[in-house]
């Protein structure tokens, strides 16, 4: 068993070294170049038309019987991103790579804002209607419909189904079980069974119930956690400037061994920052597009904007605030505090009454919503590979069993499995994103000309088959040419 653990750890270190740095940063930078930095140039517009509409009655908050609203889609996706990656993941990055890892997490987040925008936009443009008249989409659909690469789509789905067992089930149940154990002292085996029962109750209702659940829980848990974080940062206000400076300098000249910190090389700092960066926002994995493809939206770009905001909220906002609390506490170099407890210990130091409880409760809620949301992604991967209800039921059972196993597992080994699985999803997904960048540019130009500031809406029932496929089949489209929307009603 130890040999297997060592092999997984070595493979994780290799994949999230130079290979993923190249794929994630260069691939994302290429998309920024191809889209002429559309996300950054239009960030104000994106913010006002996404989060700015959450509390208003608008197309962002409405859905029909067969779909979910954009807000429910982003809540489901955020439920899959705001979890162990934002709390335990950030602590792990700092513990292993030093404070400088957060700088590389920022770089990954800025690049990934466009990456996630791109994959969600393409997922909506290539989505289909299933036998229940519900939208289905994701990387497997733009790999097949957009590029006619069904073999690569199947490969992504296989990698995805395996990865989700680690990222969704093992990691999140591990984080949730440890949080409950910290609060109550209840045996981990009992906690695992309780997690399993609660999860079954939610996932049996499908994407509609998952979306409704996430829409209620995500805002609540975000306010709870961020509220406590802001209070602590006010307490540490005189240290914030030096903490931010430390993050930047440590990114290029990592801290040598000090206290309980073993020291880190530049590559270690980059590796842990990027790995935790992608785990905190999912960009490039191809998972979130599966939820967004089910949204009630009139245009792919309009839904893609929610993806950019997801990355900003989960990585730039939540991860940074968590990191500042940890660094200001000074506990990151304490050998007696492991990564699993680092964030809770930092909160407890600043808020002796209730600090650790807030982190444990927040992590419990974060992890459970992630656990539920990622089952949906896994089911979508299996559904693409086979229509067999028996196989889907078996996968559901395995996912549930893994949630019990994860509640008993060691943290480092669980993270290593997840890192390897995530890498196997990234590669085929980026092949699709790069090769379909021309179609992505067309979709942006179509949105800019016909919908962005015109007040017009597209058709909420447009799919790849009845509208967007006409774009993807024009192999010799000139980038400067903008097509008028096709009218299929006349």
Where are the predicted features?
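N-terminal alpha-helical transmembrane segments of multi-pass membrane transport
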Residues: 1-80, 84, 95-101, 112, ...
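Transmembrane alpha-helical segments of multi-pass small-molecule transport proteins
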Residues: 21-26, 152-161, 182-207, 223-225, ...
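Extracellular/periplasmic helix-exit of transmembrane alpha-helices
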Residues: 117-127, 230-246, 254, 258-261, ...
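Transmembrane helix-loop junctions in multi-pass membrane proteins
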Residues: 3-4, 34-39, 85-90, 166-177, ...
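Membrane-interface loop-to-helix entry segments
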Residues: 23-30, 34-47, 174-180, 187-248, ...
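Alpha-helical membrane segments and immediately flanking helix-loop junctions
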Residues: 58-96, 122-140, 144, 158-161, ...
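Flexible loop linkers connecting adjacent transmembrane helices
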Residues: 37-68, 92-102, 106, 114-147, ...
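Helix-loop-helix module between adjacent transmembrane segments
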Residues: 31-32, 108-133, 139-174, 178-203, ...
């Amino acid at each position: 068993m130890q040999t297997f653990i060592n092999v997984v750890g070595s493979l994780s270190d290799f994949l999230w070294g130079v290979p993923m740095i190249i794929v994630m940063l260069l691939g994302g930078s290429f998309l920024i170049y191809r889209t002429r930095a559309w996300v950054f140039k239009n960030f104000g517009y994106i913010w006002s038309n996404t989060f700015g509409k959450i509390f208003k009655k608008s197309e962002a908050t409405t859905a029909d019987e067969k779909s979910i609203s954009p807000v429910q889609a982003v809540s489901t996706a955020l439920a899959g991103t705001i979890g162990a990656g934002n709390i335990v993941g950030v602590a792990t990055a700092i513990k292993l790579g030093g404070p400088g890892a957060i700088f590389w997490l920022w770089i990954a987040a800025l690049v990934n804002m466009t990456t996630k925008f791109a994959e969600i936009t393409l997922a909506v443009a290539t989505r289909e209607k299933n036998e229940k008249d519900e939208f289905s989409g994701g990387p497997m659909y733009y790999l097949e419909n957009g590029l006619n690469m069904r073999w690569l789509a199947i490969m992504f789905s296989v990698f995805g189904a395996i990865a989700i067992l680690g990222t969704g089930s093992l990691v999140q149940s591990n984080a949730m079980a440890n949080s409950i154990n910290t609060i109550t002292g209840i045996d981990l085996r009992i906690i695992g069974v309780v997690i399993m029962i609660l999860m079954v109750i939610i996932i049996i209702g499908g994407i509609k119930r998952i979306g409704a659940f996430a829409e209620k829980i995500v805002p609540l848990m975000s306010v709870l956690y961020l509220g406590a974080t802001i209070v602590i940062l006010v307490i540490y206000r005189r240290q914030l400037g030096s903490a931010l400076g430390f993050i930047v300098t440590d990114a290029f000249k990592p801290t040598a061994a000090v206290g309980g910190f073993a020291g880190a090389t530049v590559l270690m700092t980059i590796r842990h920052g990027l790995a935790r960066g992608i785990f905190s926002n999912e960009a490039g994995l191809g998972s979130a597009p599966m939820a967004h493809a089910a949204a009630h939206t009139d245009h792919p770009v309009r839904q893609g904007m929610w993806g950019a905001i997801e990355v900003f909220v989960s990585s730039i906002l939540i991860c940074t605030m968590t990191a500042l609390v940890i660094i200001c506490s000074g506990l990151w170099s304490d050998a007696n505090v492991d990564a699993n407890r680092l964030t809770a210990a930092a909160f407890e130091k600043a808020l002796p009454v209730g600090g650790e409880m807030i982190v444990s409760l927040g992590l419990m809620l974060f992890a459970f919503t992630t656990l539920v949301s990622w089952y949906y992604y896994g089911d979508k991967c299996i559904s693409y590979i086979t229509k067999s209800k028996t196989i889907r039921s078996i996968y559901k059972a395995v996912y549930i069993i893994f949630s019990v196993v994860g509640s008993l597992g060691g943290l480092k080994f669980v993270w290593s499995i997840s890192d390897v699985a995530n890498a196997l999803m990234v590669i085929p997904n980026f092949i699709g994103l790069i090769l379909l960048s021309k179609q992505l540019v067309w979709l942006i130009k179509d949105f800019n000309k016909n919908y962005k500031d015109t007040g017009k809406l597209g058709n909420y029932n447009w799919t790849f088959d009845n509208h967007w496929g006409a774009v993807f089949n024009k192999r010799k489209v000139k980038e400067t040419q903008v097509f008028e929307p096709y009218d299929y009603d006349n």
